[in-house]
């Protein structure tokens, strides 16, 4: 009985607190738990201690989840397999995809790739092109594709998410980043199947993102490769296997990576192929051999080449619009790629690549690289190089598309087709072979394909392809693969030596690019099959180069072999025109490798280009083994070997740079690039880029790319990269070499690659990126990818036409070397620029001087106005570089602003360099010449507050005027909050300086937009003469978290002063609390601001400013009509609401609140004179005041004595308006204001707004308040105490028992700020009373009045029927409101509560 009593009494209390009317039912034996559940279900959930009847998520807990037949509503809630509610909102496809993604994650990198591929695959499906289905297959390969596939649809919708999530899951951070990218890509995937294919690529790239992911991506690509051919796929599958292994470990990756590399190349290719596969259709063509395609392409490759490209192009055509958009997207998407964006772009790339088919392939490559990029920035760097390669390829591929007919040729190439494959190399090979054969112009196209060979990176897949080309080629590929795998291993290196990776990535690029180059080597092999093998060896060596330069050396001998291929290149040289094309052709795959070689091959085309290319050779160096070989061959096969040595290691390269010198004057040029190349080594990836350069136009791009890669590697690299920028000059040449078309394509390539580098800048650059310069701009995009890259990228920006101008600023002496005199002067500027912005400035003058050249070249910049845009970007980039990557954050802005400034380009270059501020309206040098010239500086920064989600943007605009003593500075603060409200604060500081002093006037203009209504407040801030004085100008609300976790606000005073320099200084003065005891014994806390000032005699003056917390709630009880006498004596009727409130003494007070006036009154007053006859008959003149009042059409005139005229204009209320008002707790309420119209001295109307009181709707509890109810029950066995906490937050009352909420209700009463304890004691058999301060105690059974500390009328009239066992202490309004439960049962609460207790004890 004791337990039962305790239990029931406690529940009686609970029910009483809840205000339940079911006490009788409970006390007389009804199901108590059901009754409680019915009453409290709206407040109770299982996790808050609900009854045992609500478990398992059945319809008793969540009736909204079941229809009237009890069937689950799957669209409303989430159910498990037993139709139990998991949570009362729909299961999200993303969650299931996440589950699949978890599966993916378990599958790990493969899954990841697959999931991406899934996306792609479904999308693949979408793109029939998908033939991709191979990809799907591949995705299957990648993952247990089946699951992925099944999930893939979801994945597709969520696939971006899934891809990302799964990838994210598997490769964690990298993947996550990549996953977002994947998401981007998947969206893009959504954008197009091709995108899908690219997304698979992206996925692939995501895999790459994994890093092994790259392998994984390769595995995706493997998917592609499966498309390539069963055997390719076999490789692919190996890749797949390896890729997981790769995921497992990079070493395996190495081994597998070789396959993977092949496959990854394929991946690249395949992804590119995939892209092409979207192109697949190309791919399909690829499928046809997909990679085999490569081979097939070799055989069918014509199809593949041509058709893939062609098909892809047709598909491209279909996709091409997408592609086109995507291609711009490719640029932009690449940009989008940024990284994720890269991924996205990669998808788009896919699309775009598809558009190009191969270009998109390039894109895919980019995608691939981007995924790698996703995988890791270093890899990204590397991947970006690869991407660059691929992007070159993209260019090429697009060109390939153009060349695709050539591709047809290439199919002819088909033998080289496989070269094609490698070219994608294949295309270049093809182009090379057949294109070249067909026509050097085609060769030019093919040089694009050389870009393709960049694709060779992809082509490395193509290398796989090339293996397809021939088993031995494949062997080469394998070698390449090997190197690439090493690269993969180095990819860790890449990560660690991402510069290497960059290099290696170059090598990755290398290998991939090397792969590319290898592919290209393959291409080279294509140049000669054995050569290719050599090339592959080179590839191997190049990765080995990554591994060790000595191998590079050895490989360089191989390179020599390849140099024989180089010889081919040389031969290409013979066909130098073709070299341009043909060199690209030449090994154009090599050219790819060469391409880096290409440059050299192209270089071969023209030694000057070679020189330029030699930079690229440096770049090639990176390709070093092969590309350099190419380069070397071009330089000289052995020289290039030297170059390779350089490639072998940047330090060696440095050493070798001397070799480079020896390598030949060209090499010398390259040697500067060698310097570059040493940097290149760091930037070697850039070298990779160079290889992209290889596609010479790409070379341009790639140079840029190179620059960017190098830039990525290091700013010094940037310098070196600028040499590549030089390459970009070469680009000029190379573009010349290739053919401007290639250049165009290469630009795209650049853009893609750069896109790879970094989408954001790429984005900006992307538009330009398509421009050849843009490519470089793309490089800058890469710069965007990473701030270091950005720095480099700025050089890239330089690289872009910018290369000429900015790159000159930014670029670097290397460029100068390569650039030649233009670059030199500018390069000095640029190198110095690199060294320091000031130098850049000075140099910028030089740059300007060079800009004459720059100008000339800048004309180039301008001529390549895309480049100019680039140069703008350069500017922006440089500003970014100079300012720091900060600005790069908003690379888009930069691009735009930069582009804006780009018109200024040359001066802006210096300006930017001189100052990161975006606006160099004039070159700083020209400003001093005009004393009265005005320079406006505008800087912008955005700060996002993590805690409350508001982002605040500060824009500072300063306009100093020389030779004038007045300066105006304006700072605009824009705060955007999650509730869609926007607050703009404008601080205007006017400093007027005379000969001796400066006076500052400050005014803050605060504008708040709430729900479409605008409130403007002018807050003048007085000038504080004494610095020691603290004057609280205004108060502010500071959010504070109490120790118990409650969030409240504290009022602080803001003291605003001006220091000796005339700058505004604000200081926060916390307001102290003063405790005071009220008459009823309650202690209140009053916040007051303590203001300390210094008096006239130096004494300290302390002033306390009390701050009232309390808000009264006013309700209009009724409306009446009141007569009102105006200042002019006229009496009018107004409508007013009568508000009845209770003051602190408990007395009722009435107060009228004006509502709406019935008429509009206009008035004026003036003086008049008229004659007056005095009593003595004399006539004089008297002056009187006349007040004229107009009401509607009526006019009233009143004459008063002059002394009775109002001293100020009469104020007449025109109307009452309700305006929004934001309370300190961020609640938005309304405020009633009167609009007053006054007449000034000139009888002009003046409008004034004044608040007229509190609106009837306003209720604002100052703080979250909570009270404690201590409930004690006693019986023979002793006493037990229960504590119930009542928390009041806003107008929500939450009652908790033992920490769990049992009642939550809304109250319309204003809840005052206080905290009280209420004690209840119940003793059986006798009466006990607990005295508490301020309480009224009565032991008689008569009614006990409950008196509250506040005298609230809600409680005054109520009474408690007290049994002999109950005593009620003082109850505050908030506590009483809680105890009374909801409004429906408040009147009967006390009765139920007492009766319930009595009955409970009777039953007990």
UniProtKB/Swiss-Prot annotation:
The UniProt keyword set, sorted, is: Cell membrane, Glycoprotein, GPI-anchor, Lipoprotein, Membrane, Repeat, Signal
GO CC terms: plasma membrane; side of membrane
Expression is induced as follows: Induced during chlamydospore formation and filamentous growth. Expression is regulated by the NRG1 and TUP1 transcription factors.
Disulphide bridges, residue numbers: none
Residues with lipidation of kind GPI-anchor amidated asparagine: 1382
Any idea where this protein resides?
A: Cell membrane
Pro-peptide region(s): 1383-1404
Q: Which parts of the sequence are annotated with region: 88 X 6 AA approximate tandem repeats?
A: 104-541
Region of interest called Disordered, as start-end residue ranges on this chain:
113-833
List the protein's name. Answer: Probable GPI-anchored adhesin-like protein PGA55
Task: Give the organism the record lists.
Answer: Candida albicans (strain SC5314 / ATCC MYA-2876)
């Amino acid at each position: 009985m004791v337990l039962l009593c305790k239990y029931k009494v406690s529940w009686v209390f609970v029910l009483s607190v809840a205000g339940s009317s079911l006490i009788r039912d409970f006390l007389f034996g009804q199901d108590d738990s059901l009754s409680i559940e019915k009453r409290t279900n709206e407040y109770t959930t299982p996790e808050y201690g609900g009854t045992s009847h609500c478990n398992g998520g059945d319809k008793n807990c969540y009736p909204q989840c079941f229809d009237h037949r009890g069937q689950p509503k799957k669209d409303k809630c989430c159910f498990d397999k037993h139709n139990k509610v998991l949570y009362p909102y729909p299961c999200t496809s993303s969650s299931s995809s996440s589950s699949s993604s978890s599966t993916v994650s378990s599958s790990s990198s493969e899954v990841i790739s697959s999931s991406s591929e899934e996306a792609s695959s479904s999308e693949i499906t979408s793109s029939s092109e998908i033939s991709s289905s191979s990809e799907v297959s591949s995705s299957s390969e990648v993952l247990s594709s089946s699951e992925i596939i099944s999930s893939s649809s979801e994945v597709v919708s969520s696939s971006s998410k899934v891809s990302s999530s799964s990838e994210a899951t598997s490769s964690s951070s990298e993947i996550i980043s990549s996953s977002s990218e994947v998401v981007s890509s998947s969206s893009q995937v959504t954008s197009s199947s091709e995108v899908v294919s690219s997304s698979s690529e992206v996925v692939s790239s995501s895999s790459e993102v994994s890093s092994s992911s790259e392998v994984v991506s390769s595995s995706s690509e493997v998917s592609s490769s499966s498309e390539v051919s069963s055997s390719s796929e076999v490789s692919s599958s190996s890749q797949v296997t390896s890729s997981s292994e790769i995921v497992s470990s990079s070493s395996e990756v190495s081994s597998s990576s070789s396959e993977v590399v092949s496959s990854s190349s394929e991946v690249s290719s395949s992804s590119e192929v995939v892209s092409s596969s979207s192109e697949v259709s190309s791919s399909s063509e690829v499928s046809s051999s997909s990679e085999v395609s490569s081979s097939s392409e070799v055989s069918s490759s014509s199809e593949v080449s041509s058709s893939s490209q062609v098909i892809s192009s047709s598909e491209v055509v279909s996709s091409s619009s997408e592609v086109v958009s995507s291609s711009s997207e490719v640029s932009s998407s690449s940009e989008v790629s940024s990284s994720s964006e890269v991924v996205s772009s990669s998808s788009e790339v896919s699309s775009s690549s598809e558009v190009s088919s191969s270009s998109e392939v390039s894109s895919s490559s980019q995608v691939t690289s981007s995924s790698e990029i996703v995988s890791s920035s270093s890899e990204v760097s590397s991947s970006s190089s690869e991407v660059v390669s691929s992007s070159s390829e993209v260019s090429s591929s697009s060109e390939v598309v153009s060349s695709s007919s050539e591709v047809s040729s290439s199919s002819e190439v088909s033998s080289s087709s496989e070269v094609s494959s490698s070219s994608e190399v294949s295309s270049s090979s093809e182009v090379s072979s057949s294109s070249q054969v067909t026509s050097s112009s085609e060769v030019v196209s093919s040089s694009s394909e050389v870009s393709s060979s960049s694709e060779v990176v992809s082509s490395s897949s193509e290398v796989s392809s090339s293996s397809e080309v021939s088993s031995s080629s494949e062997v080469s590929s394998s070698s390449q693969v090997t190197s690439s795998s090493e690269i993969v291993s180095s990819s860790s290196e890449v990560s660690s030596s991402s510069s290497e990776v960059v290099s290696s990535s170059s090598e990755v690029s290398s290998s991939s690019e090397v792969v590319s180059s290898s592919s290209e080597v393959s291409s080279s092999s294509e140049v000669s099959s054995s050569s290719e093998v050599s090339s592959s060896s080179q590839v191997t060596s190049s990765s080995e180069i990554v591994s060790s330069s000595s191998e590079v050396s050895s490989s360089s001998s191989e390179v020599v072999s390849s140099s024989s291929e180089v010889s081919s290149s040389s031969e290409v040289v013979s066909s130098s025109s073709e070299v341009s094309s043909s060199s690209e052709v030449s090994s154009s795959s090599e050219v790819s490798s060469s391409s880096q070689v290409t440059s050299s091959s192209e270089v071969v085309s023209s030694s000057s280009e070679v020189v330029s290319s030699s930079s690229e050779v440096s770049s090639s160096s990176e390709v070093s083994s092969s590309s350099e070989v190419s380069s070397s061959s071009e330089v000289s096969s052995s020289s290039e070997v030297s170059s390779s040595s350089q490639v072998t290691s940047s330090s060696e390269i440095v050493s070798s740079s001397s070799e480079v010198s020896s390598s030949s004057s060209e090499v010398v040029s390259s040697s500067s690039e060698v310097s570059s190349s040493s940097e290149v080594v760091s930037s070697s990836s850039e070298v990779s880029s160079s290889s992209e350069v290889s596609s010479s136009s790409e070379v341009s791009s790639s140079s840029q790319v190179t620059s960017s890669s190098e830039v990525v590697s290091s700013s010094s690299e940037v310098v070196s990269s600028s040499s590549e920028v030089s390459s970009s000059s070469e680009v000029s040449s190379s573009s010349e070499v290739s053919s401007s078309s290639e250049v165009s394509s290469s630009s795209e390539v650049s853009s893609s690659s750069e896109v790879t580098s970094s989408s954001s800048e790429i984005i900006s650059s992307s538009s330009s990126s398509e421009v050849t310069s843009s490519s470089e701009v793309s490089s800058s995009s890469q710069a965007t990818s990473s701030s270091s890259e950005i720095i480099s990228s700025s050089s890239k920006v330089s690289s872009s036409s910018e290369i000429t101008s900015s790159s000159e600023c930014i670029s670097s002496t290397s460029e100068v070397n390569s650039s030649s005199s233009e670059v030199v002067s500018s390069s000095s500027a640029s190198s110095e620029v690199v060294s320091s912005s000031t130098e850049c400035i000075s140099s910028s003058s030089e740059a300007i001087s060079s800009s004459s050249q720059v100008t000339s070249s800048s004309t180039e910049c301008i001529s390549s106005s895309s480049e100019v845009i680039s140069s703008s970007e350069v500017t922006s980039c440089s500003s970014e570089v100079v300012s720091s990557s900060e600005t790069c954050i908003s690379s888009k802005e930069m691009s735009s602003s930069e582009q804006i400034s780009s018109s200024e380009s040359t001066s802006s270059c210096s300006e930017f360099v001189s100052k990161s501020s975006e606006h160099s309206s004039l070159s700083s040098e020209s400003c001093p010449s005009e004393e009265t010239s005005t320079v406006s500086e505008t800087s912008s920064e955005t700060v996002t507050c993590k805690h409350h989600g508001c982002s605040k943007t500060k824009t500072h605009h300063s306009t100093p005027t020389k030779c004038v003593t007045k300066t105006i500075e304006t700072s605009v603060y824009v705060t955007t909050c999650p509730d869609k409200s926007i607050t703009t604060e404008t601080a205007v500081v006017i400093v007027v300086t005379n000969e001796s002093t400066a006076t500052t006037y400050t005014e803050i203009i605060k504008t708040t937009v709430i729900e479409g209504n605008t409130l403007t407040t002018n807050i003048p801030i007085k000038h504080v003469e004494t610095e020691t004085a603290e004057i609280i100008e205004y108060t502010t609300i500071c959010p504070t978290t109490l120790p118990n976790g409650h969030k409240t606000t504290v009022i602080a005073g803001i003291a605003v002063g001006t220091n000796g320099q005339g700058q505004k200084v604000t200081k926060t003065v916390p307001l102290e609390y003063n405790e005071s005891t009220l008459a009823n014994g309650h202690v209140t806390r009053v916040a007051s601001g303590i203001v300390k000032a210094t008096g006239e005699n130096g004494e300290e003056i302390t002033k306390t400013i009390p701050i009232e917390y309390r808000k009264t709630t006013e309700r209009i009880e009724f409306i009446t009509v009141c007569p009102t006498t105006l200042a002019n004596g006229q009496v009018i009727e107004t409508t007013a609401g009568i508000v009845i409130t209770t003051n602190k003494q408990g007395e009722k007070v009435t107060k009228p609140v004006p509502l709406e006036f019935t008429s509009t009154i206009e008035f004026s007053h003036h003086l008049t004179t008229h004659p007056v006859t005095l009593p003595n008959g004399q006539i004089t003149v008297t002056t009187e005041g006349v007040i004229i009042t107009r009401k509607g059409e009526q006019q009233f005139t009143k004459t008063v004595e002059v002394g009775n005229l109002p001293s100020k204009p009469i104020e007449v209320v025109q109307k009452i308006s309700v305006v929004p008002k934001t309370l300190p707790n961020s609640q938005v309420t309304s405020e009633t204001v009167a609009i007053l119209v006054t007449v000034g001295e000139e009888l002009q109307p003046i409008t004034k707004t004044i608040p007229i009181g509190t609106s009837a709707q306003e209720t604002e509890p100052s703080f979250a308040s909570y009270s404690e109810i201590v409930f004690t029950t006693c019986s023979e066995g002793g006493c037990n105490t229960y504590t119930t906490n009542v928390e009041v937050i806003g107008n929500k009352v939450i009652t908790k028992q033992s920490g769990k909420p049992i009642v939550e209700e809304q109250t319309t009463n204003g809840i005052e700020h206080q905290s009280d304890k209420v004690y209840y004691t119940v003793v059986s058999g006798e009466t006990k009373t607990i005295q508490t301060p301020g309480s009224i105690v009565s032991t008689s059974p008569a009614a006990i009045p409950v008196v509250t500390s506040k005298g609230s009328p809600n409680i005054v009239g109520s009474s408690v029927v007290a049994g002999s066992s109950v005593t009620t202490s003082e109850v505050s309004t908030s506590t009483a409101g809680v105890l009374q439960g909801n409004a429906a049962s408040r009147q009967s609460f006390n009765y139920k509560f007492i009766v319930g207790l009595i009955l409970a004890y009777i039953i007990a």
